[in-house]
Amino acid sequence: MVRREIKNFQLVYGGESYACSVPFSVKSVLSAAGIECDELSGVACFESDIYVDDAALAMRNFYLRVRGINTPAAVYVEDKLIGKVDGKTPIYNFDASGILRKGNNRLSIRFDSSDCDLNYAGLCETVEILRFSAAIIDRVLMTQKHEDGSVKLDISLDFIGDKSSVRAVATLVSSSGQIYYAGLTKGQGSIEIKDPLFWWPRGLGVQNLYRLSISLYGEIDIEDNVEIRLGLRTAAIGDGGNLVINGVSTLLMGAVYIPDGNPDITVANDKATASVSSAAMANYNCLIIPLGAPKPTEKFYDLCDVHGIMVVEEHSTLDDGVISSLHHRSNHPSLCLIDLIGKDTKPAEVESLSAILPNMSLRVLENQPEYFGLPSLPSMKTIRSVVPEDERSLFSHSVEAMAEEGAIRNMLMSVADRYPYPADLSAFAYASALASAHKVGEVIKNSRLSLGQSGRGVFYRLNDKDLSISASAIDCRGRWKPIQYYSVRHFAPVTLYADMVDGVVTFRASSQRRLDLIGSLEYRIADASNHTIYTESVEVEIGAMTSPTLHTVNIGDMIKGREREFYLEYLIREGSYVVSRETMLFVPEKHFMFKKPSLKVVITGQDRRFSITIASDVFVKDLELSFDGVDAVFENNYLDLTSDAPVKVNFTITGGIETSFHLKDVLELRSVADLK
């Protein structure tokens, strides 16, 4: 087979022509030419030449392979229609045999505004010219059969061309280097894996991946070769908000993710990388792609495979285009569940669809799930970059223009419940984001303690595409809000919770790991100066995937009359390692009698990797770490300092290279006490 890419095109629109190279959209090409249009109409054509010589004409088969078109389009060669694109199917192979002639042949991909939004019409990937004598691989279908600790991988190939004169060989390589071979007779065959290495979601095990290579041999040369990465796992619907992965009931914990939808595949992949990496760092094990959201790129699924993040896709229908897309992605172990939303789906249809998509679970819902979210302001760095200084107040035109419906009202109410009245917009941004993190934490807590019976441990949403006051955990510039840092704790494999009713504190734990935990529950009552009033330690055992009550204690008499001065610190220790640590105030933060801290700070490191060590002489609640003019991602933030023992936090600079001396100069610290 001979393969040639077509990357360079001319956009023909409005009587003008503009040079462009894949990836592109109508909007991106016009913007590069200095033309800004809010609404585009009519027909836009992307044209290129296909040169054919005598050697090419000697080939028996000539196909165009088109990928990366997410809107309806029509493909022409020399003004002859050779195929239509529906924008749903990931790959199209159009037969151009008998149409192409010696010399230059005009290729035209046409988008009509009556079928799509021209702003986003374009190509994310190059068009390929495929010339071959016998056959090439069109599609690879795989089914996993798990039985008695082994896996049978059934492989089925669809061909373009004459498959009778080719033979196929499959090679499977495990992450440990073990190799399996199989011949595929007439494109069909199986590989028996006696000692499989399973793919596990994040927090439950290793994300083992296999590499499958399929070579198609003709009479003389290799006609085609396809490489696929896959994971071995089972997936089934569990109770409540759970999925059963490899026989283990797993609570879905994460956020709704709305892909950027940028037609520039490079930009889209960069944003997908940032989003999935951020989710993994914050202990997410799932992302929900909501109904109507742009389709993620292939890179997104690759990243979720590597990081162990389960993907749930919502669909209102499973038409041929959607099924083709799901087939194309069925090798990804991360794509575990399809939520089919609609009242008209019949059980027989579900059974039929499950047979078509054997590596995914299918759940039918009457209505689209709703996930809790509470709005907060973007990072103040983001606000300062776009909002004029004289407009930096909550009720200014610039700030109100960023707000989603009801956002400011909801923020005011949530801040009023917990915090002192903020003195300025920066303080309000800090308080509103903390309030959002705490409210979401309550929803996650209920889900975890009920083992998913109260619903998934999922909030709305991970990311913003545009500047807005929203419920997102990461703003449009990629800056983490408190809810993203709190997610490190919300979604940790083991979390500890404390609730007090009438002076009685109940400690409960949630475990989302496959091993039991034997350790100690330690708690203490302390004052604002971190002096211990009372302390106790009890031995505890937490079973795998359980949410037990660990201990109850009546502290009403100890804190009576001094609720504004005392707080509760509690933790679980496994050996010498602190698995989970939290604090609880007995009154809202606005009523607690904080003392002014004296903080000692040391920053060490170089280039982009640093650590900050902080110590305080008094209790500090939700200490925010940030730098003026420098972006960083911390392994932990919004810290509670409960003793004079130093706390060390590693962090990574996301911009250029820095020095510890400069970072010390631009360090910004604030806590809840600074709101008063």
Where are these regions (language model features)?
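Secreted/periplasmic carbohydrate-active enzymes, especially glycoside hydrolases
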Residues: 1-298, 303-307, 320-327, 336-337, ...
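Substrate-binding clefts and catalytic carboxylate motifs of secreted carbohydrate-active enzymes
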Residues: 11-13, 69, 368-517
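Structural detector of well-ordered beta-strand residues that form the stable sheet scaffold
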Residues: 108, 287-288, 310-312, 361-365, ...
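Active-site region of glycoside hydrolase catalytic domains
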Residues: 138-140, 288, 322-400
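Short, internal active-site loops enriched in acidic
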Residues: 236, 343-344, 462-466
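A cross-domain feature marking catalytic cores of carbohydrate-active enzymes
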Residues: 254-259, 291, 313-315, 340-342, ...
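Short acidic/His/Gly/Ser-rich catalytic and metal-binding motifs that mark active-site loops
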Residues: 263, 313, 467
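Beta-strand-loop-alpha-helix segment that lines the small-molecule cofactor/substrate pocket
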Residues: 308-318
